[in-house]
């Protein structure tokens, strides 16, 4: 009977090749998910909804859950949102990360709590960002719409424009997905 086993060198090469392909196709599979609640350090604010945090010595981008900041093209609102987030979370700030999911870009999506206070609530109250549930479909436990409504009723931030500026998700959809949130 003839053996159908491949030589060891060929098997090792095939296994290595499959590992490389899987790491390219599924990059987050090699990263452990964050704990549901953990303390992380802010390294930088990338924009009004994305923060670079230190996960055990590795810098990773994370997106604030259940909100949408104005897009870079939506000035001055995008810069104002980023500036307000930088003011709330200067580099080196320790925060509690409450993991929710990963988005389509592979980013961790989470709530960030500073001394027990939800950073997103502050941004929404200031009228810096929009409440948005489009990515997760699981934001009903949060009162973000209430904070947005209060900012809108008092004409704070982006709500100084009647009705507010164009919603970022509408711009993204109109671009055929070319614009990245």
Q: Where are the model-predicted features located?
A:
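Small beta-barrel nucleic-acid-binding modules, primarily SNase/OB-fold domains
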Residues: 2-7, 11-17, 22-181
